[in-house]
Amino acid sequence: MCIRDRHNSVSINLNVLEEQRKRNEVTGRNYTKIFYSGSACMYPEHNQLDPDNPDCSEDSAYPANPDSEYGWEKLFSERLYFAYHRNHGIPVRVTRYHNIFGPEGTWDGGREKAPAAICRKVAQLPPVGGHIEVWGDGEQTRSFLYIDECIEASRRLMDSEFIGPVNIGSEEMVTINELTEITSRVAGKPIKRNHKM
């Protein structure tokens, strides 16, 4: 994502928080919880290098070192929400989503999650199967969570007194190679992976 997108995202978050602060000041009340949809992309890159033991626990975010501008923006915005909570008493709830998937999700164009991209690649193969491209060696692990479970977890957080951050994802880790094998089996199409390093 470009810098303008990051700027827009930060501006939106700041405007939401600032408007709530002003409203609370005028009304003398502070009852509206504000939800922030964070991302596991804010975790340090070095925490995720070992595919057999990624460290994405909520307390492992620091020292900060996300691997993309998107991750840095998510981390900054999360800190912004916590600052407004501390300094202005605004009740916030903060999540860190891990690879949420389901219907109506993006499935092409380069912004799709791994399950959608792999399903699309396999679906586009002829009935006899073929080759699909996989980034990296395929041993990188991910936690995937279906959208309905994500919504339920988010709702529970909103109903609780805990502000977060809370990881919302599956405890089960799946390698990209395993995901391609599952997709191949379900589709009934044999595949060979071309690993793009």
Question: Whereabouts are the PLM-identified features?
Answer:
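Conserved small/polar residues in nucleotide/adenosyl-binding loops
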Residues: M1-D5
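Short-chain dehydrogenase/reductase
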Residues: R6-V10, C56, Y62, P66-E78, ...
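Active-site Tyr-X1-5-Lys
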Residues: L17-E19, R23, N65-H98, A117-V128
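Structural signature of the Rossmann-like NAD(P)-dependent dehydrogenase/reductase core
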Residues: K33-G38, R93-N99, E133-G136, S143, ...
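C-terminal substrate-binding subdomain of Rossmann-fold SDR/epimerase-dehydratase oxidoreductases
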Residues: Q124-M197
